[in-house]
């Protein structure tokens, strides 16, 4: 009995170790694919003059986030992180590059608006509105990508389902933004962990949070 218990504990700890390794690999690949953006965001001040170059360097974020989500979703059955990441990245670029251009354009427009309105006290309402729209866009994007990974649909169908879930399962859907921000704030206290696990850990936590929503949709599909 004690031997079985020991083996179970060893298996349990090994699975944790596997996830640490997988998250590290996925995070390094994510940083590699977004290296120009990561470098620029650290060396450039965010101001109107730098927004175009930040925009151009950030269009890789959405396809690479898709690749991380897709890779982590099937990691227990397909643990070859590097191979799977690049397969899914190629698919992500085919499906999402044009959409990424649009999403990132609106994101940086909002950032620019926030920069301008922050300096004009008479436009404080617009300042907070742009912050709100920015939060909505980021939350919608991560949820959209998780939905896309879980069901084969067109871009339009994926967007519609994501919007419906944001209404029906609003708490879970909106919680993902807090998870993203909270993860980076906590890991920022330990920069080495932020570098090693930041993006992949935040994405994994968003996927875990969204799992009940996925189960809900799957039940609806089975009952239909």
Identify the meaning behind each predicted range.
Residues 130-135:
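Small-residue-enriched core segments of transmembrane alpha-helices in multipass membrane transport
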Residues 1-112, 122-128, 139-142, 147-224:
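Helix-coil boundary and N-terminal low-complexity module in membrane systems
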């Amino acid at each position: 009995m004690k031997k079985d218990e020991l083996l179970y504990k060893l298996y349990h700890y090994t699975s944790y170790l596997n996830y640490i390794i997988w998250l590290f690999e996925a995070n390094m690949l994510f940083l590699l694919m977004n290296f120009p953006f990561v470098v620029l965001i650290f060396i450039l001040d965010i101001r109107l003059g730098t927004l175009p170059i930040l925009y151009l360097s950030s269009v890789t974020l959405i396809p690479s986030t898709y690749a991380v989500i897709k890779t982590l979703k099937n990691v227990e059955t397909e643990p070859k992180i590097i191979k799977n990441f690049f397969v899914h990245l190629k698919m992500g670029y085919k499906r999402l590059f044009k959409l990424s251009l649009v999403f990132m354009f609106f994101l940086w427009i909002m950032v620019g608006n926030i920069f301008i309105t922050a300096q004009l006290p008479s436009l404080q309402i617009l300042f907070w509105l742009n912050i709100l729209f920015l939060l909505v866009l980021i939350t919608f994007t991560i949820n959209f990508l998780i939905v896309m990974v879980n069901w084969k649909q067109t871009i339009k169908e994926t967007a519609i389902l994501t919007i419906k879930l944001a209404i029906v399962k609003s708490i879970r859907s909106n919680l993902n933004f807090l998870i993203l921000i909270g993860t980076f704030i906590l890991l920022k206290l330990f920069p080495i962990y932020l570098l090693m696990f930041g993006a992949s850990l935040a994405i994994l936590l968003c996927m875990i949070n969204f799992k009940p929503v996925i189960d809900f949709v799957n039940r609806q599909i089975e009952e239909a």
